[in-house]
Amino acid sequence: MVLGGYPVSYLLLCGQAALLLGNLLLLHCVSRSHSHNATAEPELTSAGAAHPEGSPGAASWEYGDPHSPVILCSYLPDEFIECEDPVDHVGNTTAFQELGYGCLKFGGQAYRDVEHTRVQCRALDGIECASPRTFLRENKPCIKYTGHYFITTLLYSFFLGCFGVDRFCLGHTGTAVGKLLTLGGLGIWWFVDLILLITGGLMPSDGSNWCTIY
C-alpha cells in the first residue's frame, strides 16, 4: 500500500526511529539534570545553610540564616542528645580551674546543696542541626547513682540494724563493724540510725544519691 507516494511500512519505520530518538534525548536531559542537582546540593540547601563534608549519618550545617528551620545543636532538647557524666574532680580545685567545669563534690538533699556544672554532650546520629555536634550543656546537677535505694536500706536498718547491715550496705564499713560488735549500741545506735536515715543524715559513703523508683 502506497500513501502519498511512500509505502506505509516506510512511514512506520521512520516514526519508530523518531520516537526512539526522542526517548534518548529525554533520558539524556534527565541524567544531566540529576547530576547537576547532586553537585549543587552540598553547596546550599533550600533552608539557606551550607552542608559540610562528612558522613551521611551525622549531617550538620553551618548556622547562617536565623530564619532557617535548622537550629543550633546546643538548642536541641534532651531527648535528641546524649551527655557524658559530670567530671569528678574529687575536691581538686586546681583541676577544676584548669578544665573550667566539673564537680568538686557530689550529692546533696536540697537544690541549694547540689553543685551544678557543664557537661560534654553531642547530638544523636541522624539528627540534623547546625554548628558543632559536640558542645557543653549547662546546669547539670552533680549527682550520681550507684544502686542504693532508700526503702531497701530502711528495711535493712529496721530488721538487721543491730548487726550493722545498713551501714555495711552504704559503705560505712568502720562504723558498721562497731555497730555489729556492740549489737547496735544496745539498741541506741540502731534507733539513732533509723532517725538519721529518715531525716537524710545517713547517706551512701560514695556521695551518691538514692535511686528513684518509677
Swiss-Prot record:
Transmembrane regions listed in the UniProt entry: 145-165, 183-203
UniProt KW keywords: Glycoprotein, Membrane, Signal, Transmembrane, Transmembrane helix
Domain of life, source organism: Eukaryota
Subcellular location: Membrane
GO cellular component: membrane
Pfam families the record matches: TM2 (PF05154)
Entry similarity comment: Belongs to the TM2 family.
Protein known as: TM2 domain-containing protein 2
Native source organism of the sequence: Bos taurus
